[in-house]
Each structure stands twice: as structure tokens, then as C-alpha cells.
């Protein structure tokens, strides 16, 4: 972090941020070190509100600090079964309705890109009642993290993160 701060002071780097998807508790420990982060990337979707919630725990802290928030995993990393539970358009609108600077959306085909762009065209924020309705819709299957495997498995973890948290790297 000292090197990052030095680079920012020398105007070689403009913004310094972090990306966390495993647990908001890990990110909050990072914030407790006192570094002045400019932004954080975090998963934000209707399922997140029920299980290890970045929306409830980390998002408010970043806003309190005046830092930008970049949403990720609006579609739960592609884990939401097509046409079931929450539609992709609903999940995107949910993430865009939160107090974020941007939302990164993974597109693995031109069809997904077109669908995402169509959802963004004419976007209107959900009101609080609509946001809560989507959280409630997700709640019955969200409590165990089954649609947020980046939180519950090591499938998405790189070797540095695994090593830092005491896991064996194979």
C-alpha cells in the first residue's frame, strides 16, 4: 500500500481500489487498516442481501467514506437459472438502482450484450418497495449461497488469496 500511495502522490496512479467477492468481513478488515481507498468493487444482486451481504455491510461504509462503489456479479456470476427466480433484466435494474458509480456486467456473447444494452436503455431506478420485493423473491434460495459460488467455494479464488487465508494451493 505504501508503493500505491507513493504512485498516487506522484500522479502516476489516479485511483486506488480493491475488489472483493468472498466476504464483506474480509473487505471491512482491509478498511480497518486506515488506507484511503478511492473505490471498491463488490457483488451486488438480490441474492447478496440475504447471504454475507456486501450491500448491507460494505456498501454503506464505502459511501460513508466518500469512496466510489463498482458493482459486480449483478447476474450472480451467471448462476441464476434462466427464466427462474429473478430475470436478468430485474437483476441488472436492481444493481443499477443501488448507490453505485458503475456496474460491471459480464457478457459472454453478443446476445447477452444486446440484452444488457436493451435493459440499460430507458433505465429507471427501482423504488425501495420494488428493491425489497426482489430481495424477498430471492430469499428462499439465497440463504445458503448456492447462486453466489464466488462466496462459498474456492473456484473463484486465485493462489495469492488462498495462500493469504491459509489454504493449500494445488
Residues covered by each model-derived region:
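Glycine/proline-rich, positively charged
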Residues: 1-53, 57, 63, 67-70
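Structured C-terminal cap/extension of enzyme domains
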Residues: 33, 49, 55-170
